[in-house]
């Protein structure tokens, strides 16, 4: 699986950069994902978790 939050499913979103002349070029807004060790089915596993999920206590580190 790609870089996506294991808990909430948050991932990068896309949009456009706009110049003063309103020309557009594609860009990405990356989610604040951190690689952490958590318990998955009783075993420690390294997964990508969003900083928001870590701060809100939805997941606990091992």
Curated annotation (Swiss-Prot):
Name this polypeptide is given: Large ribosomal subunit protein bL28
Organism, as annotated: Staphylococcus saprophyticus subsp. saprophyticus (strain ATCC 15305 / DSM 20229 / NCIMB 8711 / NCTC 7292 / S-41)
InterPro entries: Bacterial_rp_bL28 (IPR050096), Ribosomal_bL28 (IPR026569), Ribosomal_bL28/bL31-like_sf (IPR034704), Ribosomal_bL28_bact-type (IPR001383), Ribosomal_bL28_sf (IPR037147)
Keywords noted in UniProt: Ribonucleoprotein, Ribosomal protein
Signal peptide: none
GO molecular function: structural constituent of ribosome
GO biological process terms held by the UniProt record: translation
Key word Transferase present: no
A single Gene Ontology CC term: ribonucleoprotein complex
Highest taxon in the source lineage: Bacteria
Comp. bias regions, Polar residues: 11-24
SUPFAM superfamilies in alphabetical order: L28p-like
HAMAP family recorded: Ribosomal_bL28
